[in-house]
Amino acid sequence: MPEPSKSAPAPKKGSKKAITKAQKKDGKKRKRSRKESYSIYVYKVLKQVHPDTGISSKAMGIMNSFVNDIFERIAGEASRLAHYNKRSTITSREIQTAVRLLLPGELAKHAVSEGTKAVTKYTSSK
């Protein structure tokens, strides 16, 4: 009865060594794919509002999901509005209307005023 080779024991189920994202089979390193997030912007706003407060990575992940969700909702609503009015371009007007439709009361008013302020600042800096 032949004995199994002792140089490499059989790996347990599911414990196969996977090639990492940063390596190829021939050993050359590959550029890591960038993971885009809003974390630096969330952090900047946090420091403006509460300079002495930090944020955990879990909370940052939640904030990132929140920003992505709101972005998708506003973009979807603005797209629908442009389609209803037979327009092929989403302008600041569609975004503003989408914000008014999606956000409740006072929150919508503040969002619209901050958005208008940001657009004015951007156009004046050009």
UniProtKB/Swiss-Prot annotation:
The modification N6-butyryllysine is found at K6, K21. Its main location: nucleus. The modification N6-methylated lysine is found at K117. The modification N6-(2-hydroxyisobutyryl)lysine is found at K6, K13, K21, K24, K25, K35, K44, K47, K58, K86, K109, K117, K121. The modification N6-methyllysine is found at K47, K109. The modification N6,N6-dimethyllysine is found at K58. The modification N6-glutaryllysine is found at K17, K35, K44, K47, K109, K117, K121. The modification Dimethylated arginine is found at R80. The modification N6,N6,N6-trimethyllysine is found at K86. There is a cross-link at K6, K21 (Glycyl lysine isopeptide (Lys-Gly) (interchain with G-Cter in SUMO2)). Residues 1-35 are annotated as: Disordered. The modification ADP-ribosylserine is found at S7. GO terms for biological process: nucleosome assembly. GO terms for molecular function: DNA binding; protein heterodimerization activity; structural constituent of chromatin. Monoubiquitination at Lys-35 (H2BK34Ub) by the MSL1/MSL2 dimer is required for histone H3 'Lys-4' (H3K4me) and 'Lys-79' (H3K79me) methylation and transcription activation at specific gene loci, such as HOXA9 and MEIS1 loci. Similarly, monoubiquitination at Lys-121 (H2BK120Ub) by the RNF20/40 complex gives a specific tag for epigenetic transcriptional activation and is also prerequisite for histone H3 'Lys-4' and 'Lys-79' methylation. It also functions cooperatively with the FACT dimer to stimulate elongation by RNA polymerase II. Phosphorylation at Ser-37 (H2BS36ph) by AMPK in response to stress promotes transcription. Phosphorylated on Ser-15 (H2BS14ph) by STK4/MST1 during apoptosis; which facilitates apoptotic chromatin condensation. Also phosphorylated on Ser-15 in response to DNA double strand breaks (DSBs), and in correlation with somatic hypermutation and immunoglobulin class-switch recombination. GO terms for cellular component: chromosome, telomeric region; cytosol; nucleoplasm; nucleosome; nucleus. The modification PolyADP-ribosyl glutamic acid is found at E36. Keywords: Acetylation, ADP-ribosylation, Chromosome, DNA-binding, Glycoprotein, Hydroxylation, Isopeptide bond, Methylation, Nucleosome core, Nucleus, Phosphoprotein, Ubl conjugation. The modification N6-succinyllysine is found at K35, K117, K121. The modification N6-acetyllysine is found at K6, K12, K13, K16, K17, K21, K24, K86. The modification Phosphoserine is found at S15, S37. The modification N6-crotonyllysine is found at K6, K12, K13, K16, K17, K21, K24, K35. The modification N-acetylproline is found at P2. There is a cross-link at K35, K121 (Glycyl lysine isopeptide (Lys-Gly) (interchain with G-Cter in ubiquitin)). Core component of nucleosome. Nucleosomes wrap and compact DNA into chromatin, limiting DNA accessibility to the cellular machineries which require DNA as a template. Histones thereby play a central role in transcription regulation, DNA repair, DNA replication and chromosomal stability. DNA accessibility is regulated via a complex set of post-translational modifications of histones, also called histone code, and nucleosome remodeling. This is Histone H2B type 1-B. It comes from Homo sapiens. The lineage of its organism: Eukaryota, Metazoa, Chordata, Craniata, Vertebrata. The gene is H2BC3.
